[in-house]
Amino acid sequence: MFSIQQPLLVFSDLDGTLLDSHSYDWQPAAPWLSRLHEANIPVILCSSKTSAEMLYLQKMLGLQGLPLIAENGAVIQLAEQWQDIDGFPRIISGISHGEICQVLNTLREKEHFKFTTFDDVDDATIAEWTGLSRSQAALTQLHEASVTLIWRDSDEHMAQFIARLNELGLQFMQGARFWHVLDASAGKDQAANWIIATYQQLSGRRPTTLGLGDGPNDAPLLEVMDYAVIVKGLNREGVHLHDEDPARVWRTQREGPEGWREGLDHFFPAR
């Protein structure tokens, strides 16, 4: 067990973890967010969402000014005080959103794979798919280094699609509800390691890390954490880690923000 007093970074997924998958409510986690804020412990949001979406949510959660990881690690939004770092305010890994769109359109036209991207529809349709407001749905379309899509083809064709993407230096990642295409060099783990190294360089000491997530695309993040909370989720595949030592990994009984709170309660029991 470790202490809330020691240098610590908390990395958290959003949908299905800190936010309820259906209502987007986060109130069960609010007391812990306040406690971490009072202890000057950064809560670093890490999601498949766009940086525009996440900056809005970051402000809503009272976490503004902190770094965040967007688009499954393809985009790192730097902390406000990191203005001297090259690339400020955002670091983007791999090829751009526009370049990925070109690849996908070519594959769809020439090899007849069936899928619908967020670029194929308007914000009203995305609002129906997600339950977001129109204004929030519009933020989901502001990708910089990935493409979000709904797969509408067979499992056999998906395997062929993934192989073609890999040949082209891209990866296909499953989220809680949607699929994401991004550069093969990008990932939540690489982005988290970069942020950890930056905090270490600035403070002179490596912080202890705790990660929370509920979906398969959170596994790379949780693998590089010192401690991990696997929040009970909706995805049938779940999250599986190479090292699930109970001293390091806790699987919650509750879902969403209640599971988030349960995970923090587990690793920081009341004194």
Swiss-Prot record:
InterPro entries: HAD-like_sf, HAD-SF-IIB-MPGP, HAD-SF_hydro_IIB, HAD_sf, MPG_Pase. Mg(2+) binds at D13, D15, D214. It holds the Pfam family Hydrolase_3. The keyword Nucleus does not apply. It catalyses: 2-O-(alpha-D-mannosyl)-3-phosphoglycerate + H2O = (2R)-2-O-(alpha-D-mannosyl)-glycerate + phosphate. The active site is at D13. Its main location: cytoplasm. It comes from the Bacteria. It is an enzyme of class 3 (hydrolase). Its cofactor is Mg(2+). GO terms for molecular function: magnesium ion binding; mannosyl-3-phosphoglycerate phosphatase activity. Its EC number is 3.1.3.70. Keywords: Cytoplasm, Hydrolase, Magnesium, Metal-binding. One of its GO terms (cellular component) is cytosol. The keyword Ribosomal protein does not apply. It is found in: Cytoplasm. One of its GO terms (biological process) is mannosylglycerate biosynthetic process. Belongs to the HAD-like hydrolase superfamily. MPGP family. PANTHER family: HAD SUPERFAMILY HYDROLASE-LIKE, TYPE 3, PHOSPHOSERINE PHOSPHATASE. This is Mannosyl-3-phosphoglycerate phosphatase. It comes from Escherichia coli O7:K1 (strain IAI39 / ExPEC).
